[in-house]
Amino acid sequence: MREKQENERRGKGLKQYIADRRLAAVSLVLGVLMGLMILLGIRYSRNELIYRTAGQFLGQLAGWAVCMTVMVWAICVGLDALGRGWPEIRDFQFGKFLPVNSYQKRTQARRGKDCEDQGSSRDVESQGRESKQRAAKNSDLGTWLKWMFLSWCVYLPVFLAVYPGIYSYDASAQLLQFYGKLPLTTHHPLIHTLYLGLCMKIAGRLFHTYQAGMALYALSQSFFMSAVFSLCLCRMKARRAPQWLCVASWMFWILNPYLTVFSFVTTKDVLFGAFFLLSFDTACCLVEDPEHFWRGMCQKKEDLDKERELDKEKNLNETGSRKEVGKTGDWLLFFVSVFFMCLFRNQGIYVFLFFVLAVCLFLRKKVYRINWFIGASLLVAALWYVLSGPIPTAFGVGKGDAREMLCVPMQQLARIYHEVPEKLAPEEKEYIETLIDPQALSEYVRVNADPVKSGFHTEVMQADMGRFVRTWAEIGKRHPDIYLDSFLMGNWGYWYIGDNQYWISYILYDGAYLEDDLNILHITRNSHFQALSDWLREATLTPAFQSVPMLSVLLNQAFPFWLMLFAAGFAVWKRRAYEILPMMLLLGCWGTLLLGPVVSLRYALPLIYCVPRLLEMIVGLTGKR
């Protein structure tokens, strides 16, 4: 009899999901979008057409869309079933491992459900509260130290394996500028150039070898990365994330060979990614709990004061510490992280302004403290502008080349010139040859804009910007299919989850630009753990992981974008669409990647770092009605 009742209850639950129109709509939209990305991704990864007619394309798209729609629906139902706790799950007490948001905890506290001793006096309560507050603070520091220790149990052997560090990517060019061999410009972030150069100079003077300078840079950067990851794990624990998620997040950040190796690489993308992660984490906290963050930040003053009084009397979290409404610590961490994010990569300011615009559109009403947010955002933008423009110019620092932002149009023009020159008018062909060196045009490749970019004459474009725009637009108007194909061919790795990725060759484990005329400090690899070094080289330079189903997805640079789409759809289904707001940071960053010169793992690092936080958002939404 009992088994029959359980089966009926389970059947009701499944019928409830089947009848859910919102879930069906979300699954369909995501399914069609994911199916389209898979279909196009297969075409571009193979560099050949897998469909010959529009009918074939639509037929294959329909098939992929149905498969992905069913998959999205099943994942949503499965996660929600786990969160709500069906009978079998309750038997295993799975629900206690799921995070409980502070609004639920406050409601339970007000109803007296979490009070073990309702007859205790107020004095005893306050004493217990103070002791728990002290214990919570000590626990936070202890947790941070624990994660740091565990991280360095992994990082120390890796440092010995790659000693003195991985001198790669733009390090040679930056040091040539730092030591005056090349003119100093803002092409590379000044803060990173100074940081790298000072490490070399300080350690070089102290130890009389620039190998020590490289080691100082690698150690300081990896220490900062482990500190950021440990801080994020502490914040996860404070938000009552399940223990398994904290452990899985640590494994993803620290045991992932790609991310671990990058912690010792001389590229600005690593530190940019760290500050991006902090910005995203704090932005998520601002919307995850409306009672304590968005309402606390934007609520009218009289309502805010009432809420604070209620919290002082009744609101205790599980550690006994009192949660303050509108806590400013997260906002301070957010703006500091955003500021340094912008300094370490120019694209950061565009991502941040895109997020601010989304916040202003979402919070249209002028309520308490919204002006503070706008004012602080403008202050960050102004500080970035002053430190990136007027001050460097005053000290004789040159500006970066504008061609870095024009990879998409120059590739489109080069594609037309290289593959279908007969479709160009004589004056158009002549202008393209003036704009881009013929030698660079002959070296054109579909998946990398660097060869064409190296021969692009910015001064020709700037001399007559109108002609450049007109020529590009007129050719594109005649051949929109080639323009679109060129654009997608240059960035398919950021939105297609599949094998045959070409980004694997851009993890420069053994360094780059090590010729004597470029490597003026003569930095060389001197591994003290050769076996581990050989394993890391093989792991980062060969696509062997693609044979493992789960790893081939988790270590794919398109995975963060897919996870973001799923998290956004899941939030819409749960009628918590405001949780999409912090994802505007991810969407903005992803959008800038589409305009880049090549698909590379280091460019996608900021998005990859945010994967555990996205998973926490999804887990936090499970079971909510």
Q: Predicted segment positions?
A:
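Membrane-proximal stem/loop segments at transmembrane-domain junctions that anchor or position
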Residues: 394-529
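Loop-to-helix entry region of an early transmembrane alpha helix in multi-pass inner-membrane enzymes
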Residues: 190-194, 205-230
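Extracytoplasmic catalytic/substrate-binding loops of multi-pass membrane glycan-assembly enzymes
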Residues: 162-174, 183-199, 207-212, 606
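Membrane-interface anchor segments at the N-terminal boundary of transmembrane helices
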Residues: 60, 212-216, 490-582, 586
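Start-transfer (signal-anchor) and selected internal transmembrane alpha helices
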Residues: 2-35, 55-155, 621-625
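Specific aromatic-rich, kink-prone transmembrane helix
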Residues: 179, 231, 271-294, 338, ...
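Membrane-interface alpha helices of multi-pass inner-membrane proteins
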Residues: 330-345, 357, 379-384
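Transmembrane-helix motifs of polytopic, lipid-linked glycan transferases
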Residues: 115, 219-240, 278
